[in-house]
Amino acid sequence: MSGTRIEVPVDDGVLSGLDFGGQGPEVLLVHGSGHNAAVWTDVVAHLVEHCRPVAVDLRGHGQSALTSSTAEQYWRDLGAVVEALGWDRPVLVGHSTGGYAVTAAVAAGLVDAAALCVVDGMVLDDRDAATDAQAQWQNPQAAEELRETFRYGWRATEQQMFSYIEQYVREAESDWLNAGSRPELVRAVMRRSFLRGGDTLYERRPSLEEIAVVSAPDPRAPIYPSMDVYTHIRCPITFVLPARGSYAQRRDEVQTLVDAVANRHLVEISANHNVPMTRPAELAAIVGDVVRRHS
């Protein structure tokens, strides 16, 4: 299931997205850094009979030509997306950075969500620790490591792009992030991550400049990627914690976060960080349960 390409208006332009059809409760799917709307394709295949899923490419990602000039734009866009879709109290699902995006949008009052499902995208540090952690992405060495590992910002000819995509697919099964993903899904996600520019070259999204901007939020902002963001949220939250994910070693902290409020729920899953691509059926079952319980 590939979905129908759509464009969704936001304050300064449009975001690209995929409308997967279906009927029932509305579900907005938000990817993490370096991914795009196509990452949800296999999850949606198990969901679409029970709900109305739409996925968007965050600004700076996928086929959304818009880029960020402030650290908050990418999550503030979600309010405009929900309004443009004409939705009332959708379920928001976010993976990795997308998990913070949906959390921040609800915390800021931009979306009145029926529930949140946050997939390996928690924020567990206080403001001081979170500020220190964000600072690492302003380091030129960190940027170079991202460029070397993921080719973020790389500009390629069409032939170079397709050659790289096929190499990426061949190596996926031995890759720490993609092992277990369906090859055609890996190909689709990677192809969508290249945006053609006016000079006919294709840019691997996101750029390093995009990452630098979104990684420098104002520590004095009311909504910040630290654990106090959850004090602004009243709707139910389901946290999905993969056994080999980014927060596996901080399980006790996640459990404390869940135990603090009665309408929070923790679901553990045997997976690496890339849950939408490597464990789509299991994730769809979790999201489906959230939809049934809270829509």
Model regions: which residues?
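N-terminal cap/lid segment of alpha/beta-hydrolase-fold proteins
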Residues: 1-14
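Active-site loop/oxyanion-hole signature of alpha/beta-hydrolase fold enzymes
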Residues: 11, 54-93, 97, 107, ...
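Short glycine-enriched nucleophile-adjacent loop
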Residues: 99-110, 116
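Flexible "cap/lid" loop of the alpha/beta hydrolase fold
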Residues: 114-164
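Conserved alpha/beta-hydrolase catalytic His-Asp/Glu region
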Residues: 128, 151-213
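Conserved serine/cysteine hydrolase catalytic core
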Residues: 194-259
